[in-house]
């Protein structure tokens, strides 16, 4: 089932697992057990994410931020219970510098200007887009000049190996530093699902930011790749292809191994803020590293 009448699009991808997306800005995921639910990331702080979630479950909801970045924690203020890896707590409580988000606002405007042409081309020739992957206008009355993402205070700090019990379903915390020092993935071993945050993406994976660490990224992805045989789906936080099969874990690990070995080819590129970076292209993803 999809629901796309608002800024958020939702789809139940697996039993008890819903995509809650602001396409293509960010993909959040709601995971429900018998007793409680977990919302993995809260998006940009635009639109009513709590309303989107309460339309899917009446269970108590714990927010888990996969890392401190504003595009994963922007909607935290709509919820009471928030958790993050302990290394991200201070940055989460500091909140973002909104002035530094102005390039993203410009990027978003450019994207919306081009959506109509892209969608028409897609409908005529390709059929890639679906409701939950099609960019949509910002909510009525939204103005970037008034956009604010308040700091948030976590109620629980996470560490590697912690188990979150939802009642009949558990999620295990995997600390996967690389994108940021506090980055985590969440593993549903029983159902073979891995929620990758920004450790995995189907577009460029960001390994070029000031607190990114390419070698740590390689170690993290190599570790998670050891679990690939038990993973059916990998859920990613950005871009329209929000779910990949488990072998994607092996591909990403191999890509980072190639990069740290000095064997990857790069081209000059930019990120969505217009920042300079170098891009290594692989079959189903890319990796941005610092110039």
Task: List the predicted regions and their residue ranges.
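Generic recognition of long tandem-repeat/solenoid scaffolds
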Residues: 17-20, 94-95, 99-101, 280
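Accessory terminal helices/loops
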Residues: 1-2, 98, 135-139, 203, ...
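Metallo-beta-lactamase
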Residues: 37, 44-46, 146-149, 156, ...
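A generic local structural motif
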Residues: 4-6, 24-27, 48-52, 68-70, ...
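Conserved beta-strand hairpin/beta-sheet module of binuclear metal-dependent hydrolase folds
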Residues: 4-55, 186-201
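Active-site HxH/HxHxD metal-binding segment of metal-dependent hydrolases
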Residues: 48-163, 202, 251-262
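Short Pro/Gly-enriched beta-strand edge/turn motifs at strand-loop
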Residues: 10-15, 141-147, 167-169
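Structural signal for conserved beta-strand scaffold positions within catalytic alpha/beta enzyme cores
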Residues: 12, 19, 65, 83-86, ...
């Amino acid at each position: 089932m999809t629901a796309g009448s608002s800024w958020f699009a939702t789809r139940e991808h697996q039993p008890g697992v819903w995509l809650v997306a602001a396409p293509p800005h960010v993909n959040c995921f709601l995971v429900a057990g018998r007793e409680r639910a977990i919302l993995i990331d809260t998006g940009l702080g635009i639109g009513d994410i709590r309303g989107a979630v309460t339309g899917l479950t009446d269970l108590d909801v714990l927010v888990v931020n996969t890392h401190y970045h504003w595009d994963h924690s922007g909607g935290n203020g709509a919820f009471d219970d928030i958790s993050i890896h302990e290394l991200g707590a201070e940055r989460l409580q500091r909140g973002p510098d909104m002035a530094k988000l102005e390039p993203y606002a410009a990027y978003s405007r450019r994207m919306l200007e081009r959506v109509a042409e892209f969608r028409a081309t897609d409908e005529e020739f390709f059929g890639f887009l679906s409701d939950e992957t099609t960019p949509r206008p910002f909510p009525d009355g939204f103005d970037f000049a008034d956009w604010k993402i308040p700091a948030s205070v976590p109620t629980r700090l996470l560490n590697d190996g912690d188990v979150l019990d939802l009642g009949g379903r558990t999620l295990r915390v995997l600390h996967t530093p690389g994108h940021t020092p506090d980055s985590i993935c969440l593993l549903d071993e029983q159902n073979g699902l891995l929620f990758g945050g920004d450790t995995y993406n189907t577009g460029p994976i960001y390994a070029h930011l000031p607190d990114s660490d390419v070698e740590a990224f390689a170690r993290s992805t190599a570790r998670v790749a050891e679990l690939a045989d038990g993973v059916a789906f990998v859920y990613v936080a950005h871009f329209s292809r929000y779910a990949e099969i488990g072998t994607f874990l092996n591909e990403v690990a191999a890509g980072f191994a190639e990069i740290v070995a000095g064997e990857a080819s790069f081209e000059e590129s930019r990120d969505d803020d217009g920042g300079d970076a170098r891009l290594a292209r692989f079959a189903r993803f890319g990796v941005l590293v610092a110039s």
